[in-house]
From Swiss-Prot:
Belongs to the phenylalanyl-tRNA synthetase beta subunit family. Type 2 subfamily. Keywords: Aminoacyl-tRNA synthetase, ATP-binding, Cytoplasm, Ligase, Magnesium, Metal-binding, Nucleotide-binding, Protein biosynthesis. PANTHER family: PHENYLALANINE--TRNA LIGASE BETA SUBUNIT (PTHR10947:SF0), PHENYLALANYL-TRNA SYNTHETASE BETA CHAIN AND LEUCINE-RICH REPEAT-CONTAINING PROTEIN 47 (PTHR10947). It catalyses: tRNA(Phe) + L-phenylalanine + ATP = L-phenylalanyl-tRNA(Phe) + AMP + diphosphate + H(+). Its main location: cytoplasm. InterPro entries: aa-tRNA-synth_II/BPL/LPL (IPR045864), B3/B4_tRNA-bd (IPR005146), DNA-bd_dom_put_sf (IPR009061), Phe-tRNA-ligase_IIc_bsu (IPR045060), Phe-tRNA-synth_IIc_bsu_arc_euk (IPR004531), Phe-tRNA_synthase-like_B3/B4 (IPR020825), Phe_tRNA_ligase_beta2_arc (IPR022918), PheRS_beta_core (IPR041616). This is Phenylalanine--tRNA ligase beta subunit. Its cofactor is Mg(2+). Residues 270-346 form the B5 domain. It is an enzyme of class 6 (ligase). HAMAP family: Phe_tRNA_synth_beta2. It comes from Methanosarcina acetivorans (strain ATCC 35395 / DSM 2834 / JCM 12185 / C2A). The keyword Cell membrane does not apply.
Length: 545
């Protein structure tokens, strides 16, 4: 989770209250205080609240929580003067683009650092390390609209940020620190994304690096913000950045985005989303009979718009910068925060029910201990994935046991995974800049036919990775769990023929292991041999290991 440094001078100015009050109350909105110093406090905000990743966002939330300024924040937006056109050739590379202009911002060295920190934290929290979302912030005075978002040949040259000499885009990926770190996001395309102004000056090579021409300094007052990516999380990131700048006194201005075929978007879209919440839903989760008036009060403290429709229903307006409100449960959670968990009365259970570790937890602890002892690092990726990752990249046929997300917010999260291995290979693809060998595992959930299962999977990548290595790991795991097993020839297309095997226990197939097929390795843009295994442990849960 991101740790945000909040300077007291900024906090007190933006909240209108003293640092002692802030330090005492800020954990109640969903944060842990990591460090308290004379000039600043380091706070770890929960990853579901990227709108709090800046001093401006945290101050906005605290003003409501402290009853200094409640209700839905409103931001005036001026008509557009700037436009940007999107070329057809960029749509298969990085198709989503969100833009805005913010004028009249007064910067100091600390506020510039705060903005850059917000940018990088959003890259992590919303952007999956820039894969889904990358943000560019530019000094507008040095470039001339209209802008163009397009794909160009890798030989195209410009001066990247913090450099003084021109470099080709190929050289940037090979030599620039940011280029080598994020090259895997674009290197497999024939052309690379770029944003140019009317005079062919470079604003950005997303998601890699900005041009040096638009560097933000303390003299900067007017900003152009671009957010590119693979899904609608782009627009949420844009809203978070522009509203943070508006909290510091900036004036937001629309930008016209002209897409291929003449479709036009006018961004940012800060219209709140509306939801209907009932007193029954609140009682079901909080166990309290709150009136609609009390519900409205607490929602407004948490910076929602809220109005009672009758004695049982409330219309809620969700700010456009809130990425975490996916269900009414999320609204009730915020009501509980506003009401104060400390004010919710404790009810002692009528019966004595001592707890104990769940069988799944016992199994997980045992397997984790074994895998760590074998030299593997535990990872915990998301369980949401896509058909492309789950099936296509693994060279496996699509199956009918998939549970789909009804309203996915991105093309990367359209279904619940049916297997763990694709997630592990994704993690390897995001860590190619790190030293080899890399050995990772997960004991995690999969869903098949709407039934949750528990799988353990592991992968290892290095030049000498082979069938014998993964066989030894599977054998060690099975022996430590005291499970007699046998192996048979496998036909799993994700693995190389002749170097793959299925694992059976008591005549039932438990999983598969082997060397991954070169096509699978290529699909995940990996450059070395990879081996792995996955075992379904569901039938073993609760049995003595």
């Amino acid at each position: 989770m991101p740790v945000i440094t909040l300077h007291y001078e900024d906090l007190e100015k933006l909240t209108g209250t003293d640092k002692e009050t802030i330090i005492k109350r800020v954990p109640m909105i969903g944060a842990d205080i990591e460090r308290v110093e004379d000039e600043y406090v380091d706070i770890e905000f929960f990853p579901d609240r990227p709108d709090l990743y800046s001093v401006e966002g945290a101050a906005r939330a605290m003003r409501g929580f402290l009853d200094l300024e409640t209700g839905l924040p409103e931001y005036a937006i001026k008509p557009y003067e700037v436009s940007i056109s999107v070329s057809e050739n960029i749509l298969k590379i990085r198709p989503f683009l969100g833009c805005a202009v913010v004028r009249g911002v007064k910067f100091t060295s600390s506020s510039i650092k705060s903005l850059m920190d917000l940018q990088e934290d959003l890259h992590w929290g919303l952007g999956r390390n820039r894969k889904k979302v990358s943000i560019g912030v530019h000094d507008l005075k040095n470039v001339q609209p209209p802008f163009r978002y397009m794909a160009v040949d890798p030989s195209f040259e410009f001066v990247p940020l913090d450099y003084t000499e021109k470099m080709s885009m190929t050289d940037i990926l090979e030599k620039h620190p940011k280029g080598t770190r994020f090259a895997h996001l674009v290197k497999d395309f024939e052309k690379y994304p770029i944003i140019l102004d009317a005079n062919d000056n470079v604003l950005s090579f997303p998601p890699i690096i900005n041009g040096t021409l638009t560097t933000v300094t303390e003299q900067t007052t007017d900003l152009f913000i671009d957010v590119t990516g693979l899904g609608e999380a782009v627009y949420i990131a844009l809203n978070i950045v522009v509203t943070a700048l508006a909290e510091r006194g900036g004036q937001i201005e629309f930008v016209r985005v002209i897409r291929p075929g003449g479709e036009e978007l006018v961004l940012p879209d800060l219209e709140p989303k509306e939801r209907l919440l009932t007193t029954g839903e609140v009682k079901a989760l909080m166990g309290m009979d709150l009136t609609v008036e009390e519900i409205v009060k607490q929602l407004e403290r948490m910076r929602f718009g809220a109005a009672a429709l009758d004695k049982e229903a409330v219309e809620v307006k969700v700010p456009a910068y809130r990425a975490d409100i996916l269900h009414n449960y999320d609204l009730v959670e915020d009501i509980a925060k506003g009401y104060g968990y400390e004010n919710i009365k404790v009810k002692v259970p009528e019966t004595y029910t001592p707890g104990k570790s769940h069988p799944i937890s016992l199994m997980r602890a045992s397997v984790n201990e074994i895998m760590v002892g074998l030299g593997y690092y535990e990872v915990m990726p998301f369980t949401l994935t896509s058909e492309k990752i789950n099936f296509e990249n693994m060279c496996r046929p699509k199956t009918d046991d998939v549970t789909y997300v009804l309203h996915p917010i991105s093309e990367d999260q359209t279904m619940i995974r049916t297997t763990v291995l694709p997630n592990l290979l994704e993690i390897l693809s995001l860590n190619q800049h790190r030293e080899l060998p890399q050995k990772i595992f997960e004991f995690g959930e999969v869903v098949s036919n709407e039934t949750t299962g528990q799988h353990v999977a592991a992968v290892s990548i290095h030049p000498q990775a082979n069938f014998t290595e993964v066989y030894e790991v599977v054998d060690a795991l099975m022996r430590e769990m005291m499970l007699p097993y046998e192996v048979k020839e496998s036909e799993d297309p994700a693995f190389l023929e002749g170097r793959r095997a299925d694992v059976y226990v008591n005549g039932k197939k438990l999983g598969v292991f082997g060397e991954f097929h070169p096509e699978v390795i290529s699909n995940f843009a990996l450059g070395y041999a990879v081996v792995g295994f996955e075992l379904d442990l569901n039938d073993l849960i609760g049995k003595k290991i």
